[in-house]
Amino acid sequence: MKKYLVLFLSILLLGCNGQTRKALNSNLNTKSPIELIIEKEQQAEQKKYSDIGVLISTFEFKVKTNNIKDFEDGFIPWADLEKPEIDLPNLDKKDEIVVNSSSVKIIIDYPLTNQYEFILKSSKGFTRGQLLIEISKHYYWLYEEEENSATIKTIPVDKRTTMYNRNETNGKYGIWGHDIADLDISGISIYKTENGEIILTLNIES
């Protein structure tokens, strides 16, 4: 789930201004926001989907780039979910049919406490480009629904003093740790249930 684990942890630790140590010293039973995010990241990394059904196949999202200094093969191994329209023109094999099914259920569970599901239908199957756009749309919708249903609101980026990461909110999905701007998609796994339903799970980078 993480592109830059070391950088992520470094930003968190630098952003806490020493408050993590104070919190732990004052109450050993209370976890700081930083510790909670790290714990949730680890849980997300370890999550398995074998109980969903049989894994049929997987596919990747790669975006062509001229930045061969950072990406030697000329491809960024993920696509942007915040502004997919920017990556779409250079998305590798964007028009390839990657799911040969007329209906799929897509599960979004990162960075969510309670997962979000939606159904897509298409008589011709689904392409990479189509899935990138649709998944981005649903991320925007669920983030909006979270904000509307939460009593603990998202702290604006310019007002985050102890931690740069998004605070956890208590809306319908319990979003934690990341704004949409942090999120990219690097791959999708295709599962088939016992009753023939096709379910897609997402490999989201942050």
Where are these regions (language model features)?
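Positively charged n-region of N-terminal signal peptides that target proteins for export
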Residues: 1-4
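Sec-dependent N-terminal signal peptides
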Residues: 6-9
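C-terminal motif of bacterial Sec signal peptides marking the signal peptidase cleavage site
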Residues: 13-15
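Bacterial signal peptide processing site
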Residues: 17-19
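Composition-driven low-complexity segments enriched in polar/acidic and proline residues
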Residues: 23-118
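Short, contiguous acidic and Ser/Thr-rich linear segments
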Residues: 112-133
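Short loop-to-beta-strand transition segments
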Residues: 137-193
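Short, low-complexity, Pro/Ser/Thr/Gly-rich segments in the mature regions of secreted, periplasmic
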Residues: 198-206
